[in-house]
Amino acid sequence: MLPSIAKHAASHQIHPLKKHGQNFIFDGSLCDKIVRASGLEENSNVLEIGPGTGGLTRSILHKNPKLLTVIETDERCIPLLNEIKQYHPNLNIIKQDALKLKLSDLNTNKITIISNLPYHIGTELVIRWLKESSLVASMTLMLQKEVVERICAKPSTKAYGRLSVICSLIATVEKCFDVAPTAFYPPPKVYSAIVKLTPLENIPNSDLISKVELITKMAFAGRRKMIKSSLKNLAPNISELLAKLNISDNCRAENLTPNDYLSLASLI
């Protein structure tokens, strides 16, 4: 039988390292709650980034996935994960930088992603995975609460921005629950939250999404400017294009809906 998560980490003398952005979870009940929020079914193909001391890994394995692939860059954690593998042969351990991973490299059908993501690469990974959404069944992720609020934000709110637009065009998003700093060791300075993203059946093509990325980058860079000013370098006839879409050129970036940005992208 495996020791508790904390004792297992201690037996390998694993302490959190700032360079890896590590904040460990030793509370098995919290890990179970995250997996329940994912709606994980048996015989799924699962991906976890940064398993660390294996708390979330254990909870995922208790749901009997077909295969759980974990990506870990910290070589100190590999022996600990190999000990978990002795009890769960469906655990596949890859020592690699998560930013170098392409989902297509995993050679599996629809992947369920469940991860406590390092804060410093979380947003970048979400965007990358959304661009490979045809390979994703769902993503249940722990991120900074502020990032989750941006993902879930609606138009005309303070948190609404590029991330909100892109996420809502590719997936349904659901904030599951908040996680206090005290749930981690060491406690981070901010709250975290769990968010679930499920790719839509009909997703705009990659060219359109790239255009939306460009348009929103320009629009939200001048967040308080009127949209006609923010996008004046996008197209010389921007006011005409906005009028064609019944969008007032006196609107600001935060007033346009994701579909407004998509429609504008289709005209550029």
From Swiss-Prot:
Name the UniProt record assigns to this protein: Ribosomal RNA small subunit methyltransferase A
Alphabetical list of NCBIfam families matching this protein: ksgA
Annotated binding of S-adenosyl-L-methionine, by residue: N23, I25, G50, E72, D97, N116
Location, primary (coarse class): cytoplasm
Entry's EC annotation: 2.1.1.182
Purpose: Specifically dimethylates two adjacent adenosines (A1518 and A1519) in the loop of a conserved hairpin near the 3'-end of 16S rRNA in the 30S particle. May play a critical role in biogenesis of 30S subunits.
Entry's family note: Belongs to the class I-like SAM-binding methyltransferase superfamily. rRNA adenine N(6)-methyltransferase family. RsmA subfamily.
Superkingdom as given in the UniProt entry: Bacteria
Subcellular location: Cytoplasm
GO cellular component: cytoplasm
Keywords, comma-separated and alphabetical: Cytoplasm, Methyltransferase, RNA-binding, rRNA processing, S-adenosyl-L-methionine, Transferase
Lineage, top ranks: Bacteria, Pseudomonadati, Pseudomonadota, Alphaproteobacteria, Rickettsiales
Organism whose genome encodes this protein: Rickettsia bellii (strain RML369-C)
Cystine residue pairs: none
Xref: Pfam families: RrnaAD (PF00398)
Name of the gene: rsmA
Molecular functions (GO terms): 16S rRNA (adenine(1518)-N(6)/adenine(1519)-N(6))-dimethyltransferase activity; RNA binding
Catalytic activity reported: adenosine(1518)/adenosine(1519) in 16S rRNA + 4 S-adenosyl-L-methionine = N(6)-dimethyladenosine(1518)/N(6)-dimethyladenosine(1519) in 16S rRNA + 4 S-adenosyl-L-homocysteine + 4 H(+)
